[in-house]
Amino acid sequence: MTDETFADRIDALEMRATYQEEAIETLNQVVTTQWKQIDALMRQIAEIGERLREAEAARPAPANEPPPHY
């Protein structure tokens, strides 16, 4: 192999490495954004669950009345 062939191969490898670094950084940013969204959604679910428990606790007990169709 000639020096030119080696240089071409090294250039190709450097371009691949650069592309992979950019792709990894982009994917890292996407994952970070998604984790922030997941965290916010988990907090919302917990808050809604707490509100539901509070609403159920505040609801009066059902009366022992027959249904309206009787």
Curated annotation (Swiss-Prot):
Gene3D superfamilies according to UniProt = 1.20.5.300
What's one Pfam family the UniProt record gives for this protein? Answer: SlyX
Q: Which domain of life is it from?
A: Bacteria
According to the UniProt entry, where is the signal peptide?
none
Q: Which InterPro entries does the UniProt record give? A: SlyX
Instruction: Tell me the protein family, please.
Output: Belongs to the SlyX family.
The record's PANTHER family line, in alphabetical order, gives: PROTEIN SLYX
Q: What is this protein called?
A: Protein SlyX homolog
